[in-house]
Curated annotation (Swiss-Prot):
Organism of this sequence: Rhodopseudomonas palustris (strain ATCC BAA-98 / CGA009)
Sequence ranges assigned to domain Guanylate kinase-like in this UniProt record: 16-195
Stated name of the protein: Guanylate kinase
Catalytic activity line of the entry: GMP + ATP = GDP + ADP
Gene giving rise to this polypeptide: gmk
Lineage: Bacteria, Pseudomonadati, Pseudomonadota, Alphaproteobacteria, Hyphomicrobiales
Subcellular location, record wording: Cytoplasm
Family the UniProt entry places it in: Belongs to the guanylate kinase family.
EC numbers for this chain: 2.7.4.8
GO terms for cellular component: cytosol
GO molecular-function terms, A-Z: ATP binding; guanylate kinase activity
Domain of life of the native organism: Bacteria
The protein's role, per its UniProt record: Essential for recycling GMP and indirectly, cGMP.
Length: 220
């Protein structure tokens, strides 16, 4: 049945969710995020605002909203962010309006943010947030990945390794933990988590009326 009445399946609409991936640098969250967006219909990447300089190949509004520090502070004061944080001397924040618009029409929004941002997001959005922490299989594997991706200097890598311990200390604040020893296996784990969360009863708007309508037909 698809006539749009309360008792038809078309009357059930799913509210979107905020799906958070966090990890130390090099553990794989960026790769997993890209794979999820490519293979999961209805999932979109959250676009953050940042004060850091634009890198070669990046596009304003697609990769980030690039703003200066005064503009960022103005947005903070106006309550325009769901979360924001200082990361390596730059500021990052998630604009509220596009996320809320996506959730309202049943789209899921993927966040690549740290523990600090995740806590802020959960305090503002509650059960709309599902969080996953990605762990490396070992410290040695993490350091090897940072070196082989050849994006950072040795000094920056040392800083990221030092920060990794602090980031991992917050693993127990997350809903799910995935160890990324194999990117394909880790992806299937993360995708399964998202699919299960999409089907949770409390996200199905109109489900009570749908079931009630069928019961009335059966009892009538």
């Amino acid at each position: 049945m698809s006539d749009g009445t309360a008792g038809s399946y078309s009357g059930v609409e799913r509210r979107g969710l905020m799906f958070v991936l966090s990890s130390p640098s090099g553990a794989g969250k960026t790769t997993l995020s890209r794979m999820l967006v490519e293979q999961m219909p209805g999932l979109q990447m959250s676009v953050s605002a940042t004060t850091r300089p634009m890198r070669p190949g990046e596009v304003d509004g697609r990769d980030y909203y690039f703003v200066d520090r005064p503009k960022f502070d103005e947005m903070v004061g106006a309550g325009e962010f769901l979360e924001w944080a200082n990361v390596f001397d730059n500021r990052y924040g998630t604009p509220r309006a596009p996320v809320e618009a996506a959730l309202a029409v049943g789209r899921d929004v993927l966040f690549d943010i740290d523990w600090q941002g995740t806590q802020q997001l959960r305090s503002r959005a509650g059960s709309d947030v599902v969080s996953v922490f990605i762990l490396p299989p070992s410290v040695q594997a993490l350091e090897h990945r940072l070196h082989t991706r050849a994006q950072d200097s040795h000094e920056v890598i040392r800083g990221r390794m030092k920060k990794a311990g602090d980031e991992m200390s917050h693993f127990d604040a997350y809903d799910y933990i995935v160890v990324n020893d194999n990117i394909g296996v880790a992806f299937e784990s993360v995708r399964s988590i998202l699919r299960a969360e999409q089907l949770k009863r409390e996200r199905q708007v109109g489900l009570d009326a749908f079931v009630r309508g069928m019961r009335q037909q059966l009892e009538g």
